[in-house]
Amino acid sequence: QIGGVINFENVDVDNKWKKITIGVSYNQSKNNFNEFSIFDVNNNNSIDSYFLNNAEGLRLDQISAFEGESITNAYVDIGNTYGYVHQQAFLGYESFIIDPLEFNDNNSSYISNVPSGTFNQSYRSISRGYNGKLSFNAGFQYRDNIYFGLNLNSHFVDYDNYTILNETNSNGESGQFRINEIYFENRLSTFGEGFSAQLGIITKLSDVIRFGFTYDSPTWYTISEETSQYLETSMIDEDDNISLLITNPNAINIYEDYTLKTPSKISASTAFVFKNFGLFSFDFSKRDYSSMQFKPQNDIHFSNLNQEISTRLKDVNTYRFGAEILADRLSLRGGYMIEDSPYNSSSVSEFDNIDDSVNGFSLG
């Protein structure tokens, strides 16, 4: 975090505007650097189900290349014409992970060439990037008891995620065509920028009572995404010969920009300050998570997502109580917080068992 502040004092003692403060700051709000690996033995499921589920119901001629067409051209054309789901089915078909039930253009049912049994699976995820915020601040003091503040924020998102899924098996029987290894890479790059603002006021109603109010606007993001994929399969034919097939589209999917509006928040606070004794404070804030929205709304995926957000999420109220007691050179502080769950109980199944309400306290 880095920043600077310039303070302007009004030399005219009769002017009711006493002070103006202007500042700028940059804060890296989130570091997206993360890396982890998972290893497991799965006795039930193979990655073949991913390609089967995407292919089921799709015509064979919509997920296969034309005669003489390259993998790259077919992958790009299928994505532009039909979309991402068809591309996943195309990868599964071209890599021989799945086969059509019938080899004709009208076929829409598929089977797996991965024999059932036990699977050794490893998953690795590597993330890079950051979320940052550049803020321009202005503060004003009116008379001796009213303070105004304004923040204008520019947000930055840079996120790159690279995943590798590797699966091996020794299932199946000799003389059977089968897939005994799958290596699947996916890369997602997300870039975005956004804008938000905060407006606040603090007033001293007396030497004892202070009151504050803050409005945090929504953050309006414009987000761009790119994806790329790579797939390898190891095959064993009917003569038990092993061969490696590389299905590399060598292409980047660049998607249409979309926008995200996060919820706004209002906050109110009051404090009772007793000189040489301490203080008591109370803060209340409200944020409506159901107002979060993706656009364009004519996109069926975003329309369904917005509907789910508005149904499953709700207002969240947060209450904070604090106190500080002074006793000679000793200072005792304590606080308690209550925050509602963001989930709408009427739309959450009892089997989901979701309760994200928060209660906490601190002493010092």
Regions found by a protein language model. Give the residues of each.
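Outer-membrane beta-barrel porins/channels
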Residues: N7-G364
